[in-house]
Regions:
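Class I S-adenosyl-L-methionine-dependent methyltransferase catalytic core
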Residues: 1-167
Length: 167
């Protein structure tokens, strides 16, 4: 839906890519203006963008990594398809999307697990039209270890709404 079109700031995308250091093949399912895609250093990279006729939900090729800011209204559907075709999935989204239901938790557990939750402050700090807490969720196929919790902002500046002060 049009409300799902929230472009990721390039500065945010670069920080996320630098943090996770994806190797191998990589897919950006919601390319938009290319904040993630244009900064992937991987040679084997691909993209989807529904507005350009490349529907991610029809993409079937296996990839090593997916890193994206998914459409929030179809979050579960997007995650389910991502888990089918990738070994490592990183979603940049409101963090409450992840822990909303037992059904979703069971799907994640059958895939592997959440390796890391990276808190990145509020949506407004990253150009999102809301102030909910946002961050990255890193899902890894077959993972059964502890979940790491990371903060990607300066804790002493918590509450400041400037992205420059955090990244």
């Amino acid at each position: 839906t049009p409300n799902d079109v929230v472009m990721t700031l390039e500065k945010s995308a670069i920080k996320i890519i630098d943090h996770f250091q994806p190797k191998g093949s990589i897919l950006e399912p919601c390319r938009g203006t290319g904040s993630f895609y244009n900064n992937f250093q991987n040679k084997d990279k691909d993209w989807c963008e529904i507005s350009e006729g490349k529907n991610f939900l029809q993409y079937e090729k296996h990839v090593d990594w997916i890193i994206t800011n998914p459409p929030f209204s179809i979050f579960d559907l997007f995650l389910e398809h991502s888990l089918k075709i990738s070994d490592n999935v990183v979603f940049f989204c409101p963090l409450n999307k992840v822990f909303k239901s037992i059904k979703l938790d069971k799907k994640i557990h059958s895939y592997g697990g959440i390796k890391e939750v990276m808190h990145m402050g509020t949506g407004g700090m990253h150009g999102f039209p809301f102030g909910f807490v946002v961050g990255c969720i890193y899902y890894k196929r077959g993972y059964r270890g502890p979940m790491e919790y990371t903060r990607m902002y300066a804790e002493e500046k918590y509450g400041n709404s400037s992205l420059e002060d955090f990244l």
